[in-house]
From Swiss-Prot:
Taxonomic lineage from the root: Eukaryota, Metazoa, Chordata, Craniata, Vertebrata
Protein name: Complex I assembly factor ACAD9, mitochondrial
One term of GO molecular function: flavin adenine dinucleotide binding
Job of this protein: As part of the MCIA complex, primarily participates in the assembly of the mitochondrial complex I and therefore plays a role in oxidative phosphorylation. This moonlighting protein also has a dehydrogenase activity toward a broad range of substrates with greater specificity for long-chain unsaturated acyl-CoAs. However, in vivo, it does not seem to play a primary role in fatty acid oxidation. In addition, the function in complex I assembly is independent of the dehydrogenase activity of the protein.
Catalytic activity: eicosanoyl-CoA + oxidized [electron-transfer flavoprotein] + H(+) = (2E)-eicosenoyl-CoA + reduced [electron-transfer flavoprotein]; octadecanoyl-CoA + oxidized [electron-transfer flavoprotein] + H(+) = (2E)-octadecenoyl-CoA + reduced [electron-transfer flavoprotein]; oxidized [electron-transfer flavoprotein] + hexadecanoyl-CoA + H(+) = (2E)-hexadecenoyl-CoA + reduced [electron-transfer flavoprotein]; decanoyl-CoA + oxidized [electron-transfer flavoprotein] + H(+) = (2E)-decenoyl-CoA + reduced [electron-transfer flavoprotein]
Cofactor(s) required, per the database record: FAD
Active site positions: E430 (proton acceptor)
InterPro entries associated with the record: ACAD9/ACADV-like_C, Acyl-CoA_DH_CS, Acyl-CoA_Oxase/DH_mid-dom, Acyl-CoA_Oxase/DH_mid-dom_sf, AcylCo_DH-like_C, AcylCo_DH/oxidase_C, AcylCoA_DH/ox_N, AcylCoA_DH/ox_N_sf
Membrane topology: Peripheral membrane protein
In-chain residues carrying the UniProt-annotated modification Phosphothreonine: T482
Annotated EC: 1.3.8.-
Residues that bear N6-succinyllysine: K96, K242, K525
UniProt record similarity statement: Belongs to the acyl-CoA dehydrogenase family.
Pfam families given in the database record: ACAD9-ACADV_C, Acyl-CoA_dh_1, Acyl-CoA_dh_M, Acyl-CoA_dh_N
Length: 625
């Protein structure tokens, strides 16, 4: 189990599962929509312009007391089921989830969490999905299996499927009778999704697409009955020319010509089914095109963008359990006649873990609150930031926990080494963090570029008025102008106890906006090639979003008198101070010719290494002659 000693099984666990299932069904039958404030869903993009869009962010999104009590009624039984019934150590050792465990997950409705109720699912909001993710995260293999099924496997049908497709496929997918998989990655195309080679050719009678190709590292690949498959198709453009474009398909295993390899032997998430899937002359009815022919790339990106936010709540759930277990050890383990918990370097690690959990949790639920607004708001940047922050924090925090535990953390008798192995994949799947950083930065810069186009053109052409205005702004900034973006003061939305942190956020946002304009002026369209610059832009933005999330959440906690809100204030202020100074350093590195910027040295070192494909320094014991 994920950090838990196995308790009694059999009747007790079955009863827990039955209670959780009953409460969940009753809850979904009588619940009402989430009540959150409306928002313009442009928060992250507005940061690139030096603005803080308060609408939908302040105050922190919340659910009603009635909804909260109903959620908590089934959270308890569900947590009890995962604690008593799921043997994570066995799943890890045997490399598979037992059939009876999968069946109980189906009976709990966990295969249809976000499938609309009219198709047999629970129809839960993004916020409630995030809340469930905290509990499900007690076992990483189950988390990945369920996420691959519904966050990406069937998500395309919900997002862009027509009514016939939804009615045909969603009921059996939501019940778990059928399991879904998402087939995009290929041997020669990982992060470069557009370079896939799998091809779908229209049959002569134009009734089928003939699908041929192979996909790799497909979660649920050996279990799935239904696949969302992406393939190249020939598309005739308006001018009559033919081009290859990606198309998405709903593919049934029963269509034939589908085989899969044996499950991969993985470092972590070992209980999830990961394998190659091969398609050989698989006949897919034209009715099973998902979206439009040639529109598959957009479908794939929308699917991936829609689910990333939930990693924040899932990792936070795992970290909370890890903190609990590690704290018990630190408070009872004695060294030098003192408990480990009394030593400053150990205390620092607990503060770090708590801070990271608080920030990612705040970011995740702020994003889910945005996503729950009507009209499918675009929160793709926010969701990507949650994924990057939470995945890297997970790896860092589990490593720190093992350091506290010493040798015990390295032993397979305990769950900690498994947690470390399970955490590593988080930085890779659902978009590598490197690719997501580029996505975060470029999407925001593209937005800013559209807004600032005329101004940048005037600066490049030497328009006197615009140039003088820019010089004046830089002069005022250099003199230490006071930045007021409306977070503090009599009409401020941040609680006074967080005022200094709010001022730091405002200052960072202001100078970030100025820096964005400078970067667009300096690099223009060529900025897409400046990956080290884009990485810093993304890192700053992630910090700004984290600062915003904790300030909004902590202010709400103070306002409504939540227990331990003073602890939240400590965590929020700690993070904001650290993020503020990190941002200042990153902003200074983005200055042209800044001494802090080592990009050219980095490129030169890597170029020399890669030319030789080796470490090229002489051995320290070598002599010149």
């Amino acid at each position: 189990m994920s950090g838990c000693v196995l308790l009694s099984r059999g009747a007790t666990a079955a009863a827990a599962a039955a209670r959780a299932s009953r409460v969940l069904r009753e809850f979904t039958a009588r619940r009402r929509p989430l009540h959150t404030s409306l928002q313009s869903c442009s928060f992250a993009k507005e940061l690139f312009l030096g603005n803080i869009e308060q609408k939908g962010v302040f105050p922190f999104p919340e659910v009603s007391q009635h909804e909260l009590s109903e959620i908590n009624q089934f959270v308890g039984p569900l947590e009890k089921f995962f604690t008593e019934e799921v043997d994570s150590r066995k799943i890890d050792q045997e490399g598979k989830i037992p059939v009876d465990t999968l069946e109980k997950l189906k009976s709990l409705g966990l295969f249809g969490i976000q499938v609309p109720e009219e198709y047999g699912g629970l129809g839960l909001s993004n916020t409630m999905y995030a809340r469930l993710g905290e509990i499900i995260s007690l076992d990483a293999s189950i988390t990945v299996t369920l996420a691959a099924h519904q966050a990406i496997g069937l998500k395309g049908i919900i997002l862009v499927g027509n009514e016939e497709q939804k009615a045909k496929y969603l009921p059996k997918l939501s019940s778990g009778e059928h399991i879904a998989a998402f087939c995009l990655t290929e041997p020669a195309s990982g992060s470069d999704a557009a370079s896939i080679q799998t091809r779908a050719t229209l049959s002569e009678d134009k009734k089928y697409f003939i699908l041929n190709g192979s996909k790799v590292w497909i979660t649920n690949g050996g279990l799935a009955n239904i696949f969302t498959v992406f393939a190249k198709t020939e598309v005739v453009d308006s001018d009559g020319s033919k081009t290859d474009k990606m198309t998405a398909f709903i593919v049934e295993r029963d269509f034939g010509g589908i085989t899969n390899g044996k499950p991969e032997d993985k470092l972590g998430i070992r209980g999830s089914n990961t394998c190659e899937v091969h398609f050989e002359n698989t006949r897919v009815p034209v009715e099973n095109v998902l979206g439009e022919v040639g529109g598959g790339f957009k479908v794939a990106m929308n699917i991936l963008n829609s689910g990333r936010f939930s990693m924040g709540s899932a990792v936070a759930g795992m970290l909370k359990k890890l903190i609990e277990l590690t704290a018990e050890y630190a408070c009872t383990r004695k060294q030098f006649n003192r408990n480990l918990s009394e030593f400053g370097l150990i205390q620092e690690k607990f503060a770090l873990m708590a801070q990271k959990a608080y920030v990612m949790e705040s970011m995740a639920y702020l994003t889910s609150g945005m996503l729950d607004q009507p009209g499918f708001p675009d929160c793709s940047i926010e969701a990507a930031m949650v994924k990057v922050f939470s995945s890297e924090a997970a790896w860092q925090c589990v490593s720190e926990a093992l350091q506290i535990l010493g040798g015990s953390g390295y032993m397979k008798d305990y769950p900690y080494e498994r947690m470390l192995r399970d955490a590593r994949i988080l930085l890779i799947f659902e978009g590598t963090n490197e690719i997501l950083r580029l996505f975060i930065a470029l999407t925001g810069l593209q937005h800013a570029g559209r807004i600032l186009t005329s101004r940048i053109k005037e600066l490049k052409s030497g328009n006197v008025t615009t140039v003088m205005e820019t010089i004046g702004r830089k002069l005022r900034d250099s003199l230490g102008r006071t930045v007021d973006l409306g977070l503090t003061g009599d009409l401020g939305v941040v609680h006074p106890s967080l005022g200094d942190s709010a001022n730091k956020l405002e200052e960072n946002v202001h100078y970030f906006g100025r820096t964005v304009e400078t970067l667009l002026l300096r690099f223009g369209k060529n900025i897409v090639e400046e990956q080290l610059v884009l990485k810093r832009v993304a890192n700053i933005l992630i910090n700004l979003y984290g600062m915003t999330a904790v300030l909004s959440r902590a202010s709400r906690s103070i306002r409504i008198g939540l227990r331990n809100h003073d602890h939240e204030v400590l965590l929020a202020n700690m993070f904001c101070v650290e993020a503020y100074f990190q941002n200042l350093f990153s902003l200074s590195q983005l200055d042209k010719n800044a001494p802090e910027n080592l990009d050219e040295q980095i490129k030169k070192v890597s170029r020399q290494i890669l030319e030789k494909r080796a470490y090229i320094c002489a051995h320290p014991l070598d002599r010149a002659s």
